[in-house]
Amino acid sequence: ISGMSGRKASGSSPTSPINANKVENEDAFLEEVAEEKPHVKPYFTKTILDMDVVEGSAARFDCKVEGYPDPEVMWFKDDNPVKESRHFQIDYDEEGNCSLTISEVCGDDDAKYTCKAVNSLGEATCTAELLVETMGKEGEGEGEGEEDEEEEEE
């Protein structure tokens, strides 16, 4: 019995390199298919829009970008790069949907915002203004939960 198992083991070893080559060929085939996708410079299919927001609430700019290779997305506030923080949240998914969410908007956030998409073929930008409405009295409009009421109706 041990002699038979030895033969089976030696008999199966020549097939392993063939299988390994087959897998490598499949990987190469998949890479070739991916490379056939046409290269396109970035362009926006949905651009960000001007927005009026009450101080203390949240603001969100949404856009959608296409392009191949997948563009790198950067956000700017008055031409200065926006760094992600508790105040600025940046999202970008595989579908090309981009968003910049500004929590607890204050007077300093009243500015021009730009989304810039860049790949090896070029770049595209879209720009919008955020107008912050400040309340007359201190403390008004600070209530939580007011932020999302209008956005829910999409």
Swiss-Prot record:
Residues 10-19 have a biased composition (Polar residues). CDD domains: IgI_telokin-like. Gene3D superfamilies: Immunoglobulins (2.60.40.10). Keywords: Calmodulin-binding, Immunoglobulin domain. Residues 141-154 have a biased composition (Acidic residues). It comes from the Eukaryota. One of its GO terms (biological process) is tonic smooth muscle contraction. GO terms for molecular function: calmodulin binding; myosin light chain kinase activity. Residues 1-24, 134-154 are annotated as: Disordered. Residues 42-133 form the Ig-like C2-type domain. GO terms for cellular component: cleavage furrow; cytoplasm; lamellipodium; stress fiber. Corresponds to the C-terminus of smooth muscle myosin light chain kinase. Belongs to the protein kinase superfamily. CAMK Ser/Thr protein kinase family. Binds calmodulin. This is Telokin.
